[in-house]
Amino acid sequence: MIESIQELLQKEAQAVLNIPVTDAYEKAVELIVEQIHRKKGKLVTSGMGKAGQIAMNIATTFCSTGIPSVFLHPSEAQHGDLGILQEND
């Protein structure tokens, strides 16, 4: 069992190492730093279906690391949930 857990962790670590650091990636990181840390906004993720599940996971992961984040479901946004957004988000 320990071996399978170690193998899983090694695969996950390799997957993180394989993330390409492109200009788009760097711009996304800069935007997050600017809006959240300098302007005191929060990260807002959104999506439906599988993309929504991933967006929700991203928001909860950022929250657990102390970065203000919220998931906004697109259909709920049209019915009043846009109120969660503030100026620096």
Region locations from a protein language model:
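Conserved N-terminal alpha-helical segment that immediately precedes and caps sugar-phosphate-binding
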Residues: M1-D89
